[in-house]
Amino acid sequence: MQQFFRPVIQDALRSAGIETGQPVQIEKPASAKFGHFSTNIAFLSAKELGKNPRTLAQELIGHLRFPSGSIEKTEVAGPGFINFFLTPPFIMDSLGEVLRQGEAFGRGTSGNGEKAIVEYVSANPTGPLTIGRGRGGVLGDCIANLFEAEGYSVTREYYFNDAGRQMQILGESVRFRYLERCGRKVDFPDTHYQGGYIGDIADRIYQEQGDSLADAEGTGEFKSTAEAIIFSSIKKTLERLGIRHDSFFNEHTLYTPDENGATRNSRVIDALRQKGFIDEYEGATWFLTTKLGQEKNKVLVKSTGEPSYRLPDIAYHLTKYDRGFGVIVNVFGADHIDEYPDVIEALKILGHDTSRIRIAINQFVTTTVDGETVKMSTRKGNADLLDDLIDDVGADATRLFFIMRSKDSHLNFDVDLARKQSKDNPVFYLQYAHARICSLLRMAWSENGFNPEKLPDLALLKTLSSPEELQLALALLDFPDMVRSALRLLEPQKMVDYMHSIAELYHRFYQECPILKAEADTANARLLLSLATRQVLQNGFRILGISAPESM
């Protein structure tokens, strides 16, 4: 409905000769007694125009030109708010758009085909995916879905961390376990990966190679084999959750020299040096962030010659600009909070428009089973694995639970709740609304001959006017605005909350408004309202990546 009100208000501002730099904001009042929608444009503009906000609001009302029959009344309230009351026939007539557009309802064009890249998961291939990584994966997948829904050309990317010290430790860990299989005595370091999967990889190498690698120098064979096996496992886990990627960017390409011997990493240092932001001391290469007002400079290359995380991250982001992405979205875990601002500062220094970059930081996850918290540690081998969680509660519950809290909030994943097959379980509650509608439609076909493929006259919707019907219809019409809002905030949780409200309103409508036992036209009208609800649920489920069961 935002798109219904905003142009009319903008036209009224022009007609009244009111020039304001304030955006036209449309809100839903907390109580229906204040109308269906409201705007605070008069309140926001009054000070800069030197006018009384209520007087300005009244003046603006005189220039509003809504379509005939759409507005029941318009009133000024409080310190200059303009409240709008829609007519029931207009609300119900507008609902026909849901059925006319079908799967396209809620899809926008604001992206206009602009290239957007969403990077998510990007876990080191040092072990199976943990539950903590799963949250970022689902969050990123939903954010990519939101961008696609608004008309962007989206690339979903996985930054494949196949370089650095952790990968070296992985290779060493597998080598130690392999040597044990060869009968060698090994003092396995506490700092290395100890999970059972390390032994499984060592077993595979031993079965294929015997003890031929026992005296081999280095860990190359062990690292490459482990990397391939683990990354294949990661992909399979992501597939189970419906998480997909279009491209995989290998970190090692940032270390690969060109024909002049320069790497992407070294070119970053050279470019920052030319800008006066690089110095070498204490055997390391430093990014002079004290010049930016920070207390300390940041290491880009350690005294060991190993780059810090900041350097390849800067180089990687430069490739996103080089590839022509107008919108760059990074979905990070909370462990990136301290690092990414330095990456942004470096990109600014190098002359790039960092307003094109959007960051979604998701906080940590803990899991509780039987009321007790499960601890996670990939290295210690007692990690709470994502595959185990999917086995336990299913893909739909796993996805929804990961995003039913704000990404900015710590998430406690209640496994006991996710297992429940009752309305207490949020995913069950949502899917039951869809299944209930499907069951109703089957009964309508069997008893009344109602065919969802051959709809009755949509004008029948205008005969509905009960509070339950109007509340549900208005909520359904909010769907496109909710998609845009969730995208603007990079917050799929907004969609979860909205979908829950739709399910709640439908259950209330179902209880209060007889459908199949009503008079024929009323029954058909309520079936149309049910169909519109099913369509919005399906469209929302598609964004959230959960299934829409027809029976439960």
Swiss-Prot record:
The keyword Transcription regulation appears for this protein: no
Broad EC category: ligase
Placement of sequence motif 'HIGH' region: 123-133
Keyword Cytoplasm carried by entry: yes
SS bond list: none
Keyword list, A-Z: Aminoacyl-tRNA synthetase, ATP-binding, Cytoplasm, Ligase, Nucleotide-binding, Protein biosynthesis
Subcellular location: Cytoplasm
Pfam families in alphabetical order: Arg_tRNA_synt_N, DALR_1, tRNA-synt_1d
GO cellular component: cytoplasm
NCBIfam families linked to this entry: argS
Protein name listed in UniProt: Arginine--tRNA ligase
